[in-house]
Curated annotation (Swiss-Prot):
Organism ancestry: Eukaryota, Metazoa, Chordata, Craniata, Vertebrata
Notes concerning its domains: The PUA RNA-binding domain is critical for cap binding, but not sufficient for translation enhancer function.
UniProt-listed PROSITE patterns: PUA
SUPFAM superfamilies: PUA domain-like
Places the protein is found: Cytoplasm
Gene (UniProt): mcts1-a
UniProt-listed InterPro entries: MCT-1/Tma20 (IPR016437), Pre-PUA (IPR041366), PUA (IPR002478), PUA-like_sf (IPR015947), Uncharacterised_CHP00451 (IPR004521)
Protein name: Malignant T-cell-amplified sequence 1-A
Primary location: cytoplasm
Amino acid sequence: MFKKFDEKENVSNCIQLKTSVIKGIKNQLIDQFPGIEQWLNQIMPKKDPVKIVRCHEHIEILTVNGELLFFRQREGPFYPTLRLLHKYPFILPHQQVDKGAIKFVLSGANIMCPGLTSPGAKLYPAAADTVVAIMAEGKQHALCVGVMKMSADDIEKINKGIGIENIHYLNDGLWHMKTYK
């Protein structure tokens, strides 16, 4: 999604949100990420301006004080940015890939089933279409944010094909954007 993303070319406009819209977004985030509720006022303080940065391909990035927090495509689910995920790693359930998959994940490749079932990888129970953080064997922080294309049980049984779709990874265009004023 952000492989060839460039802040100067892809951002079309920025809109400050009304408090009623912010409340709706906060409720949507609580529904989508149940563990975030007690931290939401710390992530999105009430008095700070919340803005939506609109980009090409119907991508919207939610920012507070210029810090990129969440993004979504069209009216789809929100995904946390990796910078937010590094501060609050408990927001998303984790899946772990083995060392051999790291360079492919960091180049934007989807996570294949064998990379999740081999020694060194850890596959935790999760349903299909769950938003997950991809961790790596021997690393502390998440490599990417992805969406489960199969359930964890199916990944173990089938062990072929794409297991997790890579949505946003370290050093992609969104990672390089850092802040937006």
